[in-house]
């Protein structure tokens, strides 16, 4: 099945699918093309009963794709149904699945992805991202706005976010390459790896390790029970340190006293580092020595 809609002025795409694969490609076009593919008889029946509609909403168009739910013995293998959608750049994307995967290529606007066990690979988002998964993993490139992502056991990875970042995970690992605003992380047993932080972070973790590669400005608060904590501080900033661990070890390559970190940098920038741990070790050093 294939349907083409003329959609000048912007698009909001909504896809509901139980199992399968959703591929969204954004480009310099003024139309939206929806293609539904099936590779077996059961999947073909779902495609036949799917609804694909387009309606105007103010100055933009809303394109809705809905496939029937799959129950009991009629569960299909993961990618038996594929939904391919070509949309204009900066289209808003909303996808809800049970186990279907999502792949977004090209620059899009707001993205909202909810799934139980589906995975997501998202390329370039000009606005905000919201993802919620149980066991699915999410990988995101650049985010021009804010990101809010939560998972139970899946991994979360994002290359960079211009705005604020809010992450929540139980046993999945969290990784963020760079953030232009404040970062908030709540984790239980997964590892947390943060790259370049321009405005600090609040990190709470129970047993996973926490690693911050380059803290450049702002306040970093880390609360951990048994996981190790490693922090790299950018040279030249004013550093203020408050570290406590009950039974873990504290090691620092720079003096743990208030004052500038050695080397050229930004003396007007201030970093407040606060770490509390029960049994985890704490390591503090210069940022370049921590970057892998």
Regions from the PLM with identified roles:
Residues 1-292:
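Intrinsically disordered, low-complexity terminal regions
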């Amino acid at each position: 099945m294939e349907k083409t809609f003329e959609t000048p002025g912007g698009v909001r795409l909504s896809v509901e699918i139980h199992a399968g694969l959703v591929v969204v490609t954004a480009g310099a076009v003024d139309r939206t093309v929806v293609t539904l593919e099936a590779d077996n008889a059961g999947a073909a029946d779902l495609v036949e009963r799917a609804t694909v509609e387009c309606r105007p909403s103010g100055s933009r168009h809303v394109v809705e794709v809905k496939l029937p739910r799959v129950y009991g013995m009629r569960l299909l293998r993961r990618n038996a149904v594929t939904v391919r959608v070509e949309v204009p750049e900066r289209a808003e994307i909303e996808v809800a699945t049970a186990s279907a995967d999502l792949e977004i290529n090209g620059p899009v606007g707001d993205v909202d992805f909810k799934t139980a066990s589906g995975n997501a690979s998202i390329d370039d988002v000009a606005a905000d991202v919201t993802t919620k998964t149980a066991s699915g993993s999410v990988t995101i490139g650049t985010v021009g706005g804010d990101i809010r992502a939560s998972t139970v056991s899946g991994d979360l990875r994002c290359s960079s976010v211009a705005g604020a970042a809010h992450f929540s995970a139980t046993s999945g690992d969290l990784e963020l390459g760079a953030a232009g605003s404040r970062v908030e992380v709540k984790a239980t047993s997964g590892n947390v790896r943060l790259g370049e932080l321009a405005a600090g972070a609040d990190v709470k973790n129970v047993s996973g390790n926490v690693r911050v590669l380059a803290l450049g400005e702002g306040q970093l608060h880390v609360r951990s029970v048994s996981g190790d904590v490693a922090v790299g501080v950018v040279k030249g900033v004013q550093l203020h340190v408050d570290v406590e661990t009950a039974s873990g070890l504290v090691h620092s390559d720079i003096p743990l006293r208030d004052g500038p970190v050695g080397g050229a940098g930004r003396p007007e920038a201030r970093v407040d580092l606060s770490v509390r741990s029960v049994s985890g070790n704490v390591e503090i050093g210069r940022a370049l020595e921590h970057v892998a």
